[in-house]
Amino acid sequence: MVYKLCIFLAAAISGAWMATQDLAARLQYDGILGEPSFFYMDHPYYAPWRYYGWYRDLHAYIPGIFQKTYFYLYGGLLIGVLLLFFLQKKPRLTSHGSAHWGEYDDIVKMDLVSASGVVVGLYDNGFKRFCTKILRKLELCKNEKVAYAELAFDREQEDRMERGHAKLQRLEDALATVKNTKKKQALQRQKEKLERRLAHPLRYDAKRDSFLSVYPYVWLHKALQKLLMRQKHFYLRDNSNKHLAVIAPTRSGKGVGLIIPTLLGSWKESVIVNDIKSENWGITAGYRKRMGQIVVKFEPTAEDGSSARWNPLEEIPIGKPGEIAAAQNLAYILANFEGKEKLDHWGANAALVITVVILHLIYAHYADPKNYPNFPSLYKVAAFLKSNVVPKIDEEGRPVQKTVDGVLVEEVDAKGFLDTLKSLKDFEHVPEGGIEIREWSKEKRAYVMRHFDASDLREIYPQAQSIERMPHTHPIIYQNFIEILSKPDNECGSIISTANTALKEYLDPTLAMNTSCSDFCIDDAMNERRPMSLYLVTPPSDLLRLAPIFRLFFEMMVQHHAKRIGKYEHGRAKALYKHKCLFLMDEFSSLGNLKSFAATLSYIAGYGMKVFLINQGLPQINAIYGRDNQILMNCHLQIIYAPNDNDTGKYAESLIGQQTIQVESETARGGWGLSNKDYTKSETGRALITADEIKRLGEEELIIASGSPPIRTDKVKYYETNYFLKKLVDAPAVSDVIRQQPNPLRERLIRQKKHERKLEAAKEKVFRYEPEG
């Protein structure tokens, strides 16, 4: 509407200006007209609104001259009206549906025009899109030419190889019969030369083998590609607080079009990346570190020290009122290793067992560092459930000691889990004199010690029945030990078996090493001084085995950061977090069943967490979460690539809706060559894009948002523009760490990389001769 008004005013003002200049010329620029507005090439020009002042003052004296200027005045108005008429859009038909493709104004309303955010598509002007299509067609033509030429080259190469082997056989036969030494040496040289050629056959090269027929296409493609790589492109970015979902089959370009462009600087806040195969780390970690972010790689299977370590047990605030809730949440996630919507009897009781073991081991580490020297990890919890070594106690409750090589040591017993509980049910978790709890201080950026004694324990659990008679024993641990021991042996055995199954993966020594302590914590992602880029890396071979620990991470992340939405000042909420965090969950379904996490999608956006889910197809989601899942419903923006399955195509077709089209039908009447034809027009409905058309999208994608028309636009390919290519730098050799803790493997790897860089620098060093004097 605004641009139409501007067009009309431009025509009207132009007419008024021409009338003003014509009137001034007819009056020979008399002084009565006043001073001109400006001069151009010694010619006076008057502002168009001066005409109306002259009309008021002079029309009564020279009406005839004014009449001669009406042609321009009314002509401008007429042209403006005609322009409005011809620019009027044809009314859109809506009787059977009003679906239509979105345009630039719709993109602006969808908040996809942003300087930063998640890259969702490419929206170039018509000329650049035309050039890109030419490049893609030229690439197909080049590939076809190269393929045929390579096939012909391979056939010729096979013939050459056959002739070469035949010649080699003849040389060997000749060598066996020739007696002359010189001739034999010459034949031997020929044989060696031929063997080298046969051992290293030539490969097809378009410039060498098809210079006239194929190489022009290769050269033209490279030249046009270089030209387009220098051009600036318009990328659509989503920087809202709403979630996104991508449905794109494997090898469809979602990595090069969405993930990598987003990580190469488009998203400037914190990000957590589910990085299968470590591709995203290798391509984008270097640039994100250059952005000033903390770049962390958590790879549970890493054996070289390049990965940061994370111990979920260190997330529990020991000696504080929230310790039970944190331990219960952690244990529930661990027990629910299959991602069920609700745990059954055995799973719920297994969570209880894991809870009490976690709390006991942490307190025991502080209370009895001699027998529990290291802070517990998931490996220690799993091992504790298997069997234990505990001090041997005599009838009076005192440790039994013996002399070994002249040294007095305590005797120990190897016991099963239930036997261990019986001997530990009266364990003093907060002995006389208290304990010193080690915790991380963000202000000091170091570990500090906090004293905790029996009075602090009583303050946290004032209503516990056992606290009066057993002031040094943790009441919750004691009560749960008694509850477990009171269960029938068969039931207790099944519960412990369920707990062992849930924790079996953590007995892997490599996984145990990488979860033994924490180089970072989940709070750092949103509250560290600088934004953090965290890559959760796992090789495809270990995907199913390690899915539970990544599910654990994401669910703990949500539970930790979704406790309080913020504090209110002057009636407005002020966020508690320092940085927003993007959950970039590539191959979301590979993480297994995350029903509890999926249920949080409806509210976690308000806590600064934005989820970017990427799946291969709708059947993949339905197989895990059921057909009535609400995952896609909670994602405001949905991006559809050409799918491989029918369900995704039908889903997108129904989501986009129908348009109304006008069809013309022809009816013939009469006969004997005198027939007449009647034409009738009617309206009918048609899908704006059908399922089979969606499967043929090719280099295009669909962007669908609730409340807005769908956008049909081009895919991004980061390697086709220098804007992204210039950001490709080497990834760090080792992960950054926030909490400095001893890690010999990491330190050794750093020294090794430094030594390798020195050797490379020495090789590249250029020595110059500088004459003396």
Segments and roles (model prediction):
Residues 9, 274, 642:
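Active-site-adjacent beta-strand anchor residues
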